[in-house]
UniProtKB/Swiss-Prot annotation:
InterPro entries: DNA-dir_RNA_pol_bsu_ext_1_sf, DNA-dir_RNA_pol_bsu_external_1, DNA-dir_RNA_pol_su2, DNA-dir_RNAP_su2_dom, DNA-dir_RNAP_su2_hyb_sf, RNA_pol_bsu_bac, RNA_pol_bsu_CS, RNA_pol_bsu_protrusion
Protein name: DNA-directed RNA polymerase subunit beta
Assigned keywords, A-Z: DNA-directed RNA polymerase, Nucleotidyltransferase, Transcription, Transferase
EC number(s) stated in the UniProt entry for this protein: 2.7.7.6
Record GO terms (molecular function): DNA binding; DNA-directed RNA polymerase activity; ribonucleoside binding
Function description: DNA-dependent RNA polymerase catalyzes the transcription of DNA into RNA using the four ribonucleoside triphosphates as substrates.
Keyword Oxidoreductase: no
Domain of life: Bacteria
Record's catalysed reaction(s): RNA(n) + a ribonucleoside 5'-triphosphate = RNA(n+1) + diphosphate
GO cellular component entries: DNA-directed RNA polymerase complex
Assembly and interaction partners: The RNAP catalytic core consists of 2 alpha, 1 beta, 1 beta' and 1 omega subunit. When a sigma factor is associated with the core the holoenzyme is formed, which can initiate transcription.
Record-linked Gene3D superfamilies: 2.40.50.100, 2.40.50.150, 3.90.1100.10, 6.10.140.1670, DNA-directed RNA polymerase, beta subunit, external 1 domain, DNA-directed RNA polymerase, subunit 2, domain 6, RNA polymerase alpha subunit dimerisation domain, RNA polymerase Rpb2, domain 2
Pfam families noted in UniProt: RNA_pol_Rpb2_1, RNA_pol_Rpb2_2, RNA_pol_Rpb2_3, RNA_pol_Rpb2_45, RNA_pol_Rpb2_6, RNA_pol_Rpb2_7
Organism of derivation: Albidiferax ferrireducens (strain ATCC BAA-621 / DSM 15236 / T118)
Amino acid sequence: MAYSYTERKRIRKNFGSRDSVLEIPYLLQMQKDAYTAFLQADVHPKKRTAEGLQAAFEAAFPIISHNGFVEMKYLEYNLAKPAFDVRECQTRGLTFASAVRAKVQLFIYDRESSTSQNKVIKEVKEQEVYMGEVPLMTTKGSFIINGTERVIVSQLHRSPGVFFEHDKGKTHSSGKLLFSARIIPYRGSWLDFEFDPKDFLYFRVDRRRKMPVTILLKAIGLNHESILANFFVNDNFRLMDSGAQMEFVAERLRGEVARFDITDKSGKVIVAKEKRVTARHTRELEQSGTTHISVPEDFLLGRVVARNIVDTDTGEILAKANEELTEALIKKLRLAGVQDLPCIYTNELDQGAYISQTLRSDETVDEFAARVAIYRMMRPGEPPTEDAVQALFQRLFYNPDTYDLSRVGRMKFNAKMGRPESTGPMVLTNEDILAVVKILVDLRNGRGDVDDIDHLGNRRVRCVGELAENQYRTGLARIEKAVKERLGQAEQEPLMPHDLINSKPISAALKEFFGASQLSQFMDQTNPLSEITHKRRVSALGPGGLTRERAGFEVRDVHVTHYGRVCPIETPEGPNIGLINSLALYARLNDYGFIETPYRRVVDGKVTMEIDYLSAIEEGKFVIAQANAVLDKDGKLTGEMISAREAGETIFAGPERVQYMDVSPAQIVSVAASLVPFLEHDDANRALMGANMSRQAVPILRPEKPMVGTGIERVAAIDSGTVVTATRGGMVDYVDATRVVIRVNDDEAQAGEVGVDIYNLIKYQRSNQNTNIHQRPIVKKGDMLAKGDVIADGASTDLGELALGQNMLIGFMTWNGYNFEDSILISERVVADDRYTSIHIEELVVMARDTKLGCEEITRDIPNLSEQQLNRLDESGIIYVGAEVQPGDTLVGKVTPKGETTLTPEEKLLRAIFGEKASDVKDTSLRVDQGSQGTVIDVQVFTREGIVRDRRAQQIIDDELKRFRLDLNDQLRLVEADSFDRIEKLLVGKVANGGPQKLAKGTTIDKAYLTSVEKHHWFDIRPAEDDVAAQLESIKNSMEQTRHSFDLAFEEKRKKLTQGDELPAGVLKMVKVYLAVKRHLQPGDKMAGRHGNKGVVSKIVPVEDMPFMADGTPCDIVLNPLGVPSRMNIGQVLEVHLGWAAKGIGQRIGDMLQAEAKVAELRKFLDELYNGTGRKEDLAQLSDDEVLEMAGNLTSGVPFATPVFDGASEADIGAMLKLAYPEDAIRQKGLTPARTQAYLYDGRTGDPFERPTTIGYMHYLKLHHLVDDKMHARSTGPYSLVTQQPLGGKAQFGGQRFGEMEVWALEAYGAAYTLQEMLTVKSDDVQGRTKVYESIVKGEHSIEAGMPESFNVLVKEIRSLGIDIELERG
């Protein structure tokens, strides 16, 4: 395998026993593919498929006027280039979007010469019409909406189609199963069928009033006879003078108890009365040639007639279909000479008379009456005219405009009906409705199975593209209505398409969806992992989905079909548990939106490299072996029985039965869970916490790679988009802290493209969670890079690998109760070395508005401000970048006009003379909040169009232009250097006809001549060969074109920066100040490992007091050993052991480098390390210099990868510990023979502890729950308007509620005065509060409690109920 640029610097030793069969797919594929398909921006308009925007337009158009003589047709749409790029949209608070312009044609037909079949065109108008702005997805799979980064979460909803279920016996007290069916379309009315406890079958539309199902069957054109014929088989009777004969059908008799003697045709009794008919009896009857059995008269009573029986002579209907036979009716039939009497066959077991009894309860007579009944149910109170009745019924299920089953729905429907084809009409057909009722009746009869609604074959994912398309369709539907109304005017008035179409409904629908929908979420940007996880999230909530309150246990639980599709571990704790899930590592979506997972195909027991993606429905048909099944060297499954899965059950199967095999053991978990090493040794609940808390890790100042990882770290870092990767290979030409310039390889540079890539790095950018996004280059000038190599590290990455925390030396021991209840004891050295220091960036905004009293002004001229405070503000009144500020400091000076008090003429005169301004404005400057401090790192000034910019705003624009010009100059320099190289190659050795420095005709050009001539004069050389001259001219034109394009780009940038900014209504100027705050680790901060082992820092101990080893190394963190056994997360112990080995091996490599060991010796040691156990590495690829550089990077600890479910065994860890700590190291460090524990010494006394302690290195994280953000205190502050009680919460600068239980505590102690103080002057006694202030000022300490305001509120509420209540003084 070839190593990337960063892998060559540091290879992660992998303990996986199985080589990767399938690369982990791009982790943001689902989001990106879905939105690309929605926009189809790069597809030629004529080649676009009917999905996304194209489908929405095709569904809405053509629009035809009410009279049919004007028609608007859609041709194609185009997406404009966005006005601002992502970064500009973020700073300006805009939406990163592209304008959609649709080309439409307006056809006006000639009224006189047109017929309904053949319309004559009178006029055609074509125009491009603006159809709103569609937000664009960034390269990282997010959206910028109003300047903030948002993610559209995919929704897991019930797939359209037909579902059969029962109520699990919960409805009726007898526990009887009531079966039901539901046809769910993508768009349109739901159709439900359900049995009631009495076995009548009903239907309902959109959960309205239920009606007998036979009404619907009649409404679709069936009559009584055809209904019975569809659901029942017939028992044919032949009427005799006395009794009758029944046609003999063996399987109907078998198992029945004979109600009379059954005889064969010879009269011999085969089955005696009251005996059960067996297979032997029916065989005897068949052998005797019996075709009819004689039955007594009473056997016919209660039977149901299968069809209308008509008197052939008179045409009179003697018995109607579904009529029960009575003695009188049989007599009447005999008299009329009827012989053949078909009756429906029913029995108690598997052929119930449900449809027949439902039909009897139905009073409608024919198709129209049935449709009228449906109309009355849908539109109660409206008169049912014939047209209205027929139109409503058609619109319910048969009109494509109002009913859409969708491709998925039709596929699912046909599959359930057992039809071979997966396509068909997108509306319901009569056959569909009939087929559903038949299956439902079969279910009630005990044939077939109900559906499992939690099966992933019945739930599909709606992605960004589909959700956005639905919103766009909504907007277009509103436009369609409006256009239809106005199309009639286009005949009389000369209107163009843009006069008819108003794009506001589309813009409003999209804005509402992207800005306020439950599925459009503020991106979790705490660290790269939280970004990736947020984009891979699948939610069952949201519009059209479930609600938290109504979701039961079943829908939240792990289902067998989640295997390889949805992670069984990662889900939030709390009310959303199980409703919000994460996509598994290898999962993808198929065309229908169902989640698929990959499997290797197995043929005759041999595992092939062919990979098939199976959905949950398909998976149930196969036998699938696990990824850890043992294979021989030829890839054949070994062993007689292999653990496999079939139809959701775990079985043991022979190798020949196995059809597929998992691709990887990590296939079942998500990205976050697959980053937990030794996951297989952790309890599921703790693994869930570990995966969730990894997403809350704060990016640290100096990220450090985890010594014990899983091998997914690199993929996660690259796919998250946090690191910068090379889009094309090439050589690094220039590097500094803010940008990297790469000269692209000749073979990768396309003709006409600039052969230079410039990567501007992000510096101190604020994330959504106020953490710091910062990129650092890791390449050097002259390095050769391939496409995809990491150029710069981002937040929480180290050499292109995810690094969320720090590797800490952990000791598992108790320490004076400071690690009681999961508290964490930390060494002062950790804080001193800035190991957990993080930078947080706050954005503070101030706006100058146009008020009724005049304009607010941002200025340095602020009343009553000390010179010391003003020193930090520039002449525009804005603080300098780099200033360190404390709470209360002024950041931006702003004054607001005060209401003018009426002035005397003398005062007006004095004011006019002396220009005294300060008295009529008040200071409303932006100041630093209480509890925050930091350094100003950036200032942005935005000015409305038409308002003069101040000097600070102009300076910011100039700096930005300077930076941009620098980039262009770099590009130009490299392009020109490249061009001159090509010219030199072209001209050297060629004959010239003349040139600069009086070059003689016929002279051969050499390098010395070219060096002596200035490069720009090379174009003046006149080569003798015409093709060489032409090439020279072409290079010259190309260079001039590049220069011109750069000048245009610079002008465009200048125009963008100098034009006025879009600001909210009434705002003249806006200033944003960014504060960077350094947060050191302190007691109260929450920390956690990756195994759900969380805790709060209790004490920071001086390094000299920490427990230390025999060689003097002190522990960094001391954890409570009681946190391990009951929590059952043993993974942390194994991680500590392997981390201990990693550190020891690193130290050994460091010692070898210090002793200047030979490269061969280093290679030998590295070979023993990397190729002793686990996956083999090809170290021969690395040059000697690369080996030395890599060894240097390994000295702080060798990175290990222990993939989930395929990780390091105890033996592997033991082998690594042996390699790390030879015998002399054991003595030196005071280790036990197993090398897993050490004898520690008490730092305060120097005495050894009695027993050895487990020590080692663990990757420990600092979480985003920082004590600085939670700490809060209030003296006085805002009060609630009604109750006059202090507000609550830190954001409102609120107080602590002294609640009911606290009152009880004071009552229990009898502390009456303290209690009175709490409930009155310290809460809502307004007069009392004022008096307390006065007494404090006077130096007295007495309180005078009055009436609490909340009591007055209570009195007012009682009065509002009409109860007169008066207070009397006691």
